[in-house]
From Swiss-Prot:
<feature type="transmembrane region" description="Helical">
    <location>
        <begin position="43"/>
        <end position="63"/>
    </location>
</feature>
<dbReference type="GO" id="GO:0042545">
    <property type="term" value="P:cell wall modification"/>
</dbReference>
<comment type="function">
    <text>Regulates membrane-cell wall junctions and localized cell wall deposition. Required for establishment of the Casparian strip membrane domain (CSD) and the subsequent formation of Casparian strips, a cell wall modification of the root endodermis that determines an apoplastic barrier between the intraorganismal apoplasm and the extraorganismal apoplasm and prevents lateral diffusion.</text>
</comment>
<keyword id="KW-0472">Membrane</keyword>
<dbReference type="GO" id="GO:0005886">
    <property type="term" value="C:plasma membrane"/>
</dbReference>
<keyword id="KW-1003">Cell membrane</keyword>
<feature type="transmembrane region" description="Helical">
    <location>
        <begin position="126"/>
        <end position="146"/>
    </location>
</feature>
<feature type="topological domain" description="Cytoplasmic">
    <location>
        <begin position="114"/>
        <end position="125"/>
    </location>
</feature>
<comment type="similarity">
    <text>Belongs to the Casparian strip membrane proteins (CASP) family.</text>
</comment>
<feature type="topological domain" description="Extracellular">
    <location>
        <begin position="147"/>
        <end position="178"/>
    </location>
</feature>
<keyword id="KW-1133">Transmembrane helix</keyword>
<feature type="topological domain" description="Cytoplasmic">
    <location>
        <begin position="1"/>
        <end position="42"/>
    </location>
</feature>
<protein>
    <recommendedName>
        <fullName>Casparian strip membrane protein 2</fullName>
    </recommendedName>
</protein>
<comment type="subunit">
    <text>Homodimer and heterodimers.</text>
</comment>
<dbReference type="Pfam" id="PF04535">
    <property type="entry name" value="CASP_dom"/>
</dbReference>
<dbReference type="InterPro" id="IPR006459">
    <property type="entry name" value="CASP/CASPL"/>
</dbReference>
<feature type="transmembrane region" description="Helical">
    <location>
        <begin position="93"/>
        <end position="113"/>
    </location>
</feature>
Length: 204
């Protein structure tokens, strides 16, 4: 008697079916990556717009303080009454510092554009975070010191016999105070920029 053998064919999963399953994982991964990239790109666009606004605020502060000179319409034979920002070292520092802040913001625009084109890149965002933090400190120092001098110009100090001058030099005080306000607006913009960079890096 011949031995009869039975062969059972187990259908193997075709290679085409295996290939059909593989992209599913890739698609899900790409979807997650694209979602994160889209969120970061939105932050980068907002970052760019904030930098434009901060440029206007910083340069306006420097220009306003730099053009705040005022000469009183009356004078004597030997004296001419004039108030100028360069009479006070603090206001001189303010003009220089805010000009530097505005210049940095202009130079940072190309880096901000890179973060828009490459929203998942870490290096440009980290560079902006470090530089923004340093320039924020400079901006805050300039605005705070100028605010103290502006307060003295408005109110004076009886303990040191510093008399207020804003009753005589109204235009000078008005322009210098406006420059200080503009500088603090720039501080707010910088603070938001630092927060944006931190959030974008955290999502990486």
């Amino acid at each position: 008697m011949k031995n009869e053998s039975t062969t059972i064919d187990v259908p193997a999963e075709s290679s085409s079916a295996m290939k059909g399953k593989a992209p599913l994982i890739g698609v899900a991964r790409d979807h997650t990556t694209s979602g994160s990239g889209g969120y970061n790109r939105g932050l980068s666009i907002f970052d760019f717009l904030l930098r434009l606004a901060a440029i206007v605020a910083a340069l306006a502060a420097a220009a306003t303080m730099g053009t705040s000179d005022e000469t009183l319409p009356f004078f004597t034979q030997f004296l001419q009454f004039e108030a100028s920002y360069d009479d006070l070292p603090t206001f001189q520092f303010f003009v220089i510092a805010m000009a530097l802040v505005g210049g940095y913001l202009v130079l940072s625009l190309p880096i901000s554009v890179v973060t828009i084109l490459r929203p998942l890149a870490t290096a440009p965002r980290l560079l902006l975070l470090v530089l923004d933090t340093a320039v924020l400190a400079l901006n805050t120092a300039a605005a705070s010191s100028a605010a103290a001098i502006s307060y003295l110009a408005h109110s004076g100090n009886q303990n040191t016999n510093w008399l207020p001058i804003c009753q005589q030099f109204g235009d000078f005080c008005q322009k210098s105070s406006g420059a200080v306000v503009s500088a603090f607006i720039s501080v707010v913009f910088f603070t938001i920029l630092v927060v944006i960079s931190g959030v974008a890096l955290k999502r990486h």
